[in-house]
Amino acid sequence: MKLHKFENIARFPLFFQLIHRIGGGIFVGSETPRLPCRFRLEKLGKQVYSTSVLFANDKEWGSYPEMIAASDISMRFGQQTLFENVSVKFNTGCRYGLIGANGSGKSTFMKILSGQQVPTTGSISIDKDCRLGYLKQNHFDYEDVPILDVVYMGNEELWKIHQEREYLYSKVDLTEQEEERANDIESLFADAGGYTMEADAAKLLIGLGIPEEKHLQPLSALTGGFKLRVLLAQALFYNPDILLLDEPTNHLDMNSIDWLCNVLKNHRGTVVVISHNRYFLNEVCTHIADLDYQEIRLFTGNYDDFMTANAIALENIRRENQKKESRIAELKEFINRFGANASKARQATSRQKELDKIELQEIKPSSRVSPYIRFNPRNRLGEKVFEANGVSKRYDHTLFENFSAVIGSNEKVAIIGTNGVGKTTMLKLLLKLLEPCDGTVNHGETVELSYFPQDAGEILNLEDHAIDWLARFAPEEGLSEQELRSFMGKMLFSGDEVHKPVQVLSGGEKARLIIAKMMLEAGNVLALDEPTNHLDLESIEALNYALTLFPNTVLFVSHDREFIRSLATRIIEIDDGKVTDYPGTLAEYEDFKRRRARGR
């Protein structure tokens, strides 16, 4: 029997279609398997073959052992327990999405894995000689450091060699001892990949949207979001065996997310990633590590696979419990009816024994809670909503010019493009929150806007308490405190949380408070600028569903491909000063761009 091993299976989709046809249904449809795999093909006779596939999570996959393991990990902060006695293994060749509700302890667990935090109990073991890298958040430590050097620092060994090499070569005269050391350093520099370090670092930075002309500038020359991209390049530059990434897609545009997906899918080691981007989790992950019930459970497959499997498992438990409850009722009725009957005593005793053995399977309360979001417009919306005529906007350079468009009712319009091209500016121009340099913007007479800004500070008063700030947007007749509490409860503010000062709210809480404001306003046109940035997966899905149900116009900026794909009926893309207005979904628009690139 001959064993064929494919390191990059994504290159062989047609091959796997063929194997599906001759292999008796190994795969669903013609889908390329997501896991690293080995394919066995055995010839049994003339034109007769036996096929089988080993995936990286199969027991027979002997050469892909665990790389990092957590044993009996518990984490407590005072009376709060985040997780208890967690034991989990992360294997080579697998990419794990660590998911869970906000506050469940995902980032804490990632810090424990990386050695940045000590657990209350338990230990972390890493295979000998494995290199571990993680995404740092300390960009303030590198403000005056050239961007390329920040990336180089991801490989500590190479960085030290590089520094010593630079020092020796900067000296005019070298002693004999220094010359010998310089020769040794040159050899070490070559072995560590020093001759390609600049090209390797530049490739990472360009892939993350940082142009070459910026690479020698200090990190302080970049805005906050781009600084975090440099730290992501730093983690990737090390090319570690184990890569731990906490929210790597934050501040990335769609092109950079696609680039990162490809990098991680080609990573041969172990990846553990936290993300609230469903597209990213579906594209990258071979497994989901679900942090819930103060424990971590592993599922094979991506995020959608996990959601399906989890829903089926819960439904199966409910159905099984219903059957058991029905049987319990039957047994109790018989026992109560015939328990005192001498002729039925043996049967009653038998049924009592059966009853004693029946146990209902516990359905634990999940830490995941979804907010209830619904946007119900108070007044009717006319056909005309937005009209832009010859709109241009310039700062130190031209963002776009001579843009004209008419946006009608019932349209859901996504404004997309790479970071810095002017998406937020375009949105604010259409909302009349900014004045154009040229041209005009008009609103329909019936338009009543409700707005979610990218920067919560634009509308939140940090001195207010949450409930007091929200009360300002109540209908004219007002709402009682109890009614406001009930309303905020739908957005997951409970008890004394409604009186939290706005300034201490988390990013997710601020986002939910602004969404609550939009619900109270009952506007007939909704505008949202990066609404998913600070929301957890459950809140994103709840918002996504509510906007899908909304009967009127939605205008939004987003980098979340799944959010755009499921919602947008029209795409406005800004690319290097050019605006494309496409009347269709994201999938249709991307197909249009591919055909246009091929000249069709």
Spans of model-derived segments:
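Generic short N-terminal amphipathic or hydrophobic helices
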Residues: 8, 18-21, 25
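ABC ATP-binding cassette signature C-motif
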Residues: 49-321, 375-600
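Proline-centered turn/helix-capping motifs that create local helix->coil transitions or kinks
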Residues: 196, 343-347, 357-367, 442, ...
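ABC ATPase nucleotide-binding domains
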Residues: 317-331, 335-337, 344-353, 369, ...
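Short, flexible cytosolic linker that couples an ABC transmembrane/permease module to its adjacent nucleotide-binding
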Residues: 362-380
